[in-house]
């Protein structure tokens, strides 16, 4: 059984650039933001941009207050006459045209000036082609099929270009026929290199797989071409826009499934499709499939996080040479479960747009999650009260802080709407909370005081949770950018964040190696270096395009907590 994700799936350079331009403007400008037509051909991304106040228009007359507006030229580009009209209106204009489309425009402009007629091979109704046609000065012809070549008039001076997302094989065939009719034709291969690579990979993959899933907007020309190419090699090809389109598909007959996506398809949709396929495939397995499904269920419901918190609490107690208390392990597990669930319920992303792999479960059983979270926090507080008053007060105020973080909003004139909008606040607050319930609370019992061992335990818990949280956000950086969530990867960028995390991991490694010889902690600290080595392996998820489902990726990151618990077992044995 195999599920393979194409390396070229998802946003191309031009789409990513256009989206980044828009989001950067949205972050720093107070003016109303408009795009001249849909920025890219993906309905889900367009809806997300609308939720941030970025509205597509078809005519500049739709903008009432032109002095307080910014108009962004879509990635597909526009005709020069339209550009002049926009500039003469006095609007502030930002050009997000794909540089590769701009290159084709420059070719047409140059050869039109040299008295050439221009043949554009592409889709007649596509906005890119419409924009290119505007550069021909009325001397352009659009060719969509091989048969249409017969209708073009003979001309010695002909320049041939392609829509950047054209099918390469079809373009070559059309060019050959044009040359038979116009032997002096000047031909440019203006198909984007990423388009060629994407098409080549899909063709090769479709020949090897039992089924192909092509993910992307039904209005996306390049996605439709990918589906057509896959269909030629593999009859079981499905062009889907969202995971909802997969509800009636039977995965039973397919053991090897390939997945690719159009140039306008965001990563979160690809991830959800991968989740759906992995769920379908795992049901076909027997014993291993049952265990895998149980593991994924625990991840989706945050039970796995709760178990991880219990493991970290056990580790922190033993690091500090504190007698193991099942009560504190239960407090940590219950509190982390409750706060994670409440955080997801109170601060959910737009469900129909960027639903995480947990979203379906939270939508279906929302009330049940509220009840279980409420009971968990009540039990955690009761156990804490039974232990000691300082433990109860610490936990109670930590619970209040969590509620304030998720519910309190700032005045409208402030730059940030809530605590959640502060850059990196989610990563830091989560790590501090875990550090308190796993390391500090057990130390408050009886006569234990703050010391070097407690500091090491807190630093270890904080550090490992912070690294896992930030790594998870690196994988979600695209959707977080779109909805305006200021995580550390969004604020610092992917590469800088990975560098920061590697530095933190090295500091953790050094602390663990010296803490026992210096008498600060037990010798367990040596074995815990395994967790740091495991996180370094996980860095590969961020450095390369992951081919696993979102739930599996999240589960592998959270396994760093469980691994810490296994280190205790090894320590006890040896």
Which residues make up each language-model segment?
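The first (N-terminal) embedded transmembrane alpha-helix
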Residues: 296-319, 372-374, 431-438
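Solvent-exposed interhelical
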Residues: 340-374, 463-507
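The feature marks the mature, well-folded catalytic cores of soluble enzymes
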Residues: 1-261, 267-268, 274, 278-280
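Helix-coil boundary and interhelical linker segments in multi-pass alpha-helical membrane proteins
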Residues: 311-331, 380-393, 438-459, 512-524, ...
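Extended hydrophobic alpha-helices typical of membrane-associated regions
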Residues: 356-359, 420, 496, 521-574
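Intramembrane alpha-helical segments
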Residues: 360-446, 539-543
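Transmembrane alpha-helical segments that form the membrane-embedded catalytic/substrate-channel core
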Residues: 334-346, 397-412, 436, 460-475, ...
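Functional transmembrane core segments of multi-pass inner-membrane proteins
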Residues: 423, 427-472, 477
């Amino acid at each position: 059984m195999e599920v393979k994700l194409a390396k070229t799936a998802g946003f191309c350079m031009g789409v990513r650039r256009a989206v980044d331009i828009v989001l950067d403007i949205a972050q720093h400008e107070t003016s109303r933001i408009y795009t001249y037509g849909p920025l890219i051909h993906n309905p889900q991304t367009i809806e997300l941009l609308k939720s941030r106040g970025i509205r597509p228009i078809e005519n500049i007359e739709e903008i009432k207050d032109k002095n307080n507006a910014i108009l962004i030229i879509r990635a597909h580009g526009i005709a020069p006459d339209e550009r002049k009209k926009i500039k003469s209106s006095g609007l502030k204009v930002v050009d997000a045209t794909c540089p590769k489309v701009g290159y084709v425009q420059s070719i047409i402009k140059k050869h039109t000036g040299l008295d050439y007629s221009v043949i554009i091979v592409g889709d007649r109704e596509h906005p890119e082609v419409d924009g290119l046609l505007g550069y021909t000065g009325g001397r352009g012809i659009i060719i969509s099929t091989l048969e249409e070549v017969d209708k073009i008039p003979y001309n010695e001076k002909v320049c041939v270009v392609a829509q950047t997302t054209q099918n390469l094989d079809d373009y070559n065939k059309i060019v050959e026929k044009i040359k038979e009719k116009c032997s002096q034709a000047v031909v440019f291969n203006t198909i984007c290199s990423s388009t060629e690579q994407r098409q080549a990979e899909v063709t090769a993959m479709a020949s090897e797989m039992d089924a192909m899933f092509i993910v992307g907007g039904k209005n996306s020309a390049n996605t439709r071409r990918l589906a057509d190419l896959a269909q030629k090699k593999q009859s079981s090809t499905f062009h889907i826009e969202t995971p909802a389109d997969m509800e009636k598909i039977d995965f039973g007959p397919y053991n090897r499934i390939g997945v690719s996506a159009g140039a306008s398809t965001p990563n979160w949709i690809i991830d959800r499709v991968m989740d759906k396929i992995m769920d379908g495939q795992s049901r076909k397995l027997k014993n291993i499939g049952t265990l895998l499904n149980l593991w994924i269920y625990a991840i989706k419901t945050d039970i796995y996080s709760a178990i991880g918190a219990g493991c970290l609490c056990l580790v922190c107690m033993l690091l500090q040479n504190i007698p193991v208390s099942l009560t504190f392990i239960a407090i940590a597990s219950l509190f982390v479960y409750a706060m994670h669930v409440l955080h997801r319920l109170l601060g959910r992303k737009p469900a129909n747009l960027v639903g995480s792999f947990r979203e379906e479960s939270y939508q279906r059983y929302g009330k049940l999650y509220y009840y279980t979270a409420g009971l968990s926090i009540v039990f955690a507080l009761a156990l804490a009260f039974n232990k000691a008053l300082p433990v109860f007060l610490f936990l109670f105020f930590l619970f209040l802080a969590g509620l304030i973080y998720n519910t309190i909003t700032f005045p409208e004139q402030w730059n940030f709407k809530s605590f959640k909008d502060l850059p990196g606040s989610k990563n830091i607050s989560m790590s501090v909370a875990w550090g308190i319930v796993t390391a500090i609370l057990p130390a408050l019992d009886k006569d234990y005081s703050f010391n070097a061992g407690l500091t090491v335990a807190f630093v270890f818990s904080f550090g490992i949770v912070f690294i896992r949280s930030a790594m998870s956000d690196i994988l979600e950086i695209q959707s977080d950018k779109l909805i305006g969530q200021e995580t550390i990867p969004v604020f610092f960028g992917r590469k800088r964040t990975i560098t920061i995390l590697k530095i933190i991991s090295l500091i953790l490694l050094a602390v663990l190696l010296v803490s026992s010889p210096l008498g600060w902690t037990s010798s367990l600290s040596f074995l815990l270096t395994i967790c740091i080595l495991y996180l370094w392996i996980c860095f590969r998820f961020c450095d390369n395009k992951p081919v696993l489902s979102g739930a599996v990726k999240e589960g592998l990151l959270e396994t760093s907590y469980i691994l810490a618990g296994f280190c205790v077992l090894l320590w006890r044995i040896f």
